[in-house]
Amino acid sequence: MLLMIPGPTEIDERVIRAMARQMIDHRSEEFRTLMKSIVENAKKIFETKSDVFVLTASGTGGVEAAASNLTMPGDRVLVPMCGLFGERMADAFEAYGGHVIRAKLENGQGPNPEAVKKLLDEHGHVDIVAFPYNETSTGIISQNVKEIARICHERGALVVVDAVTALGGVRVAVDEAGIDFCVSGPQKCLAAPPGVALVSVGERAWEKIERKKTRPPYFDMVKYKHFLERWETPFTPAVTLFWALDEALKIILEYGYEKWLRRHAAGAAGLYAGLRTYELEFYAAKGFESPIVSAMHIPPGMTDVAIREAMKKQYGILISGGLAHYKGKMFRIANIGLISREKIVNTIFALGKVLNSLGKSVDVETAVERAEKEFDRNFPA
């Protein structure tokens, strides 16, 4: 089965083998060596000199770590939302006492400097601005996160970014962008199994975290910082998943991080070229189309279940439907991890055949040619 869903993604045989070993003591020198390797390599992907931690939790747990460590009583938290994961960020900050401003962005737009500036002007002082870099549920990506962060810092607000699907698929560049607390996960563009979260914590975030009198017992980042000084975790980690993550990061860096990003860009170019040939309508507005996951409205007379089931049963390709209140309104195709020309082309071919069988007349041959051409143009052999 070919996984073209927005996570979990397929993993390399090396990553699978890395998990097939006997357990070790998480207070041993062997584990400390493993932890050091993960952190040092993860910093290269985050492009940060800040502290990086691995939490035994999902990406959502990483977001909760940010909310629980940064939110002071009465803090005003602005969350520009364009989908479900923005809503979940808002829920997390609200659960920890934040006064959350849920700013729904309209017309298929994601967070962008103009929108964030307008919201800050409208709502006055805020302490934290939090948003997903890439909104997986609607296929919408943020624009110019660096400028968003500059505007927020100018107003005295910290910037928290959910980069769970973005890291490894696009250049996040935490330090250059000015992200204070960045959360990611391994099961998307890093091509590792789910079950841990990666977080980077910058100086501005630490200043606030260390002032906080009550921190969560499990997600206490100060505690994690103290343990990281000796390359350990405060609590028993998912050692097997640490091995997998370590191997996945090594694969990316051996392949070449720039090349890894270019391959994702080529996959996006090929995928969108094919999808546009089919005249599908995207949830994202022009300029906000996610290169990581494409979300399309369902063509008239079809259902997402019919499209997905035909893709799975007839072609062995798994794609996604909508989540929560988007269920039944869209279908989604991801471009993450071990993406290749063959996977993109096969997906475009299969989708075209399925659309034709369900009553939408499309030119499969032209779509495949355009997908191949755009992939090759962006990632020459």
Task: Tell me what each language-model feature is.
Residues 1, 325, 329-381:
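PLP-dependent enzyme catalytic core of the Aspartate aminotransferase-like
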Residues 1-56, 60:
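A glycine-/small-polar-enriched, mobile loop at the entrance of the PLP active site in fold-type I
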Residues 10-11, 187-273, 277, 381:
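Active-site C-terminal subdomain of aminotransferase-like
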Residues 49-78, 82, 86-91:
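Conserved beta-loop-alpha segment that forms the PLP phosphate-binding cup at the N-terminus of a helix
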Residues 111-168, 181, 189:
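Active-site phosphate-binding strand-loop segment of PLP-dependent enzymes
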Residues 175-187:
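Conserved active-site segment immediately N-terminal to the catalytic lysine
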Residues 281-314:
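Conserved PLP-binding catalytic core of the aspartate aminotransferase-like
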